[in-house]
């Protein structure tokens, strides 16, 4: 009997030794704001992709990243790129391309996106003749977004995302051209991908934008702006003004909290700097240490 009691006591202690750390880890994970690895925008490693696509995919996989937003195919057929992704347990959720392709070659873009396994097609700029985006440009874009977005959704099961680049935040009526675009596109067919640097640089608060339009965002580009860079409405800044998340001007925790509250599912690191290989691991670590 004594032996059984001792044996049971030892067994209980052993089980506690194993289970308590598990409970502790679960409790800790509940306190973390961003415990998972983010996705990445292929533009981050553009020079690497241009030289060696398989090796660059290996770098991404070794960083613990699973989801990639591709902004181009780097000379490959989409089926070949998809095979490389599948072999590494990677996926492409967003396929990005330019205005002319999305608007005038919609079927080709949709076929490529479907082959890659993407859910979304990202469009990153609006053409304009003058130095600045005009209300007429924005109105034309809204009409085209609604038209193409409906086609992509009804014919291919894809969703169109518009990605801001700064000039959309010019004042217009009681808000900005960006407000006009969000408010006049059909949410059934058109959603948005918020690039937080290109919203912050012209004077916007990315977290406030998410809180204002919580149902319209499906993805974020996560990046930070060097501390000594003045904010401006030019829509331009040096690539090396991209710094490690948390080392710059943007309130990253506020952005992530707003995005979590809004239910945004896709987060892509986009580091445009020449130091991306060194900075991306640090940005990932920063995100993993964020507390609620």
Give names to the regions the model predicted.
Residues 2, 22-120, 290-292:
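N-terminal pre-domain/capping segments
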Residues 1-11:
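Bacterial N-terminal signal peptides that target proteins for export
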Residues 9-19:
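Bacterial N-terminal signal peptides
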Residues 36-41, 68-70, 92-97, 121-123, ...:
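Hydrophobic faces of well-ordered beta-strands that scaffold small-molecule active sites
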Residues 40, 60, 68, 85, ...:
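Conserved, mostly hydrophobic/aromatic
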Residues 155-246:
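Acidic/histidine-rich catalytic cores of soluble enzymes
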Residues 66-67, 99-192, 277:
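Active-site acidic/histidine proton-transfer and metal-coordination neighborhood
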């Amino acid at each position: 009997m004594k032996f059984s009691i001792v044996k049971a006591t030892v067994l209980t202690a052993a089980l506690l030794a194993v289970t308590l750390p598990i409970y502790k880890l679960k409790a800790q994970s509940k306190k973390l704001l961003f415990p998972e690895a983010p996705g990445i925008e292929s533009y981050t490693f553009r020079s690497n992709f241009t030289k060696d696509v398989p090796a660059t995919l290996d770098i991404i996989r070794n960083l613990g990243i699973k989801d990639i937003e591709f902004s181009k195919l780097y000379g490959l057929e989409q089926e070949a790129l998809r095979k490389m992704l599948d072999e590494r347990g990677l996926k492409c959720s967003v396929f990005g391309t330019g205005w002319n392709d999305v608007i005038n070659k919609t079927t080709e873009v949709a076929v490529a996106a479907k082959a890659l396994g993407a859910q979304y097609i990202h469009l990153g700029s609006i053409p304009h003749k003058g130095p600045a985006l005009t209300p007429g440009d924005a109105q034309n874009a809204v009409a085209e977004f609604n038209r193409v977005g409906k086609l992509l959704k009804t014919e291919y099961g894809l969703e169109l995302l518009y990605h801001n680049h700064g000039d959309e935040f010019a004042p217009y009526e009681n808000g900005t051209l960006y407000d006009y675009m969000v408010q006049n596109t059909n949410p059934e067919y058109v959603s948005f991908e918020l690039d937080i640097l290109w919203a912050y640089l012209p004077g916007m608060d990315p977290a406030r934008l998410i809180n204002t339009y919580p149902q319209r965002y499906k993805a974020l580009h996560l990046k930070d702006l060097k501390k000594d860079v003045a904010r401006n409405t030019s829509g331009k800044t040096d690539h090396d003004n991209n710094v490690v998340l948390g080392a710059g001007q943007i309130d990253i925790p506020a952005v992530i909290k707003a995005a979590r509250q809004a239910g945004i599912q896709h987060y892509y690191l986009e580091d445009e700097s020449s130091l991306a290989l060194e900075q991306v691991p640090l940005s990932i670590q920063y995100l993993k240490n964020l507390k609620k």
